[in-house]
Amino acid sequence: MSDNFALHGTTILCLKKKEEIIIAADGQVSHGNTVLKSTARKLRTIANNKIIVGFAGSTADGLALFEKLEIKIEQYNSNLLRSAVELAKDWRNDKYLRRLEAMMIVADRSHILILTGNGDVIEPENNVAAIGSGGLFALSAARALMSYENNLTAEEIALKSMNIAADLCVFSNHNIIMEKVV
């Protein structure tokens, strides 16, 4: 099995409904077709819990990028968009960073951003973003639920969407962890 396949072996979902922003992640760590851990924590908070980061891909690479983002957040006074763009510049220009196999979703009260392994910074439409092998399942479910279930909270939509993704993606599980942007 290709090592590149490990890059997408997870599900991270972020959504905003009204003023509520939730990031959710499954807990499964896989290597090839083997589950190594089912209770991993793939979400981190920075800037006094005002910014939440979820990462998919190589754990070591994700943590390395998280540390670099945290430095940028401190450097640019918790300005998420500026910090993400500056990290992306470094990511594109640094030989070491370009080899890292990870993607991140980062969110604060104003922005939901996807940072890709190519150094892209993408602000998704429709207030929903997802990455990882189960990302498209979670994204589709969340967009449908947001369109047709007005009575559900952001947290309820995230949980239902993540469970659908876990039902369909063998590299994601039902051990869902959620963080709310404050």
UniProtKB/Swiss-Prot annotation:
Classification of source organism: Bacteria, Pseudomonadati, Pseudomonadota, Alphaproteobacteria, Rickettsiales
Stated regulation of activity: Allosterically activated by HslU binding.
E.C. no: 3.4.25.2
Keyword Metal-binding: yes
Stated role: Protease subunit of a proteasome-like degradation complex believed to be a general protein degrading machinery.
Subunit structure: A double ring-shaped homohexamer of HslV is capped on each side by a ring-shaped HslU homohexamer. The assembly of the HslU/HslV complex is dependent on binding of ATP.
Gene: hslV
Protein name: ATP-dependent protease subunit HslV
GO cellular component terms attached to this protein's record: HslUV protease complex; proteasome core complex
Subcellular location per the Swiss-Prot or TrEMBL entry: Cytoplasm
Organism: Rickettsia prowazekii (strain Madrid E)
One Gene Ontology term from the biological process aspect of the record: proteolysis involved in protein catabolic process
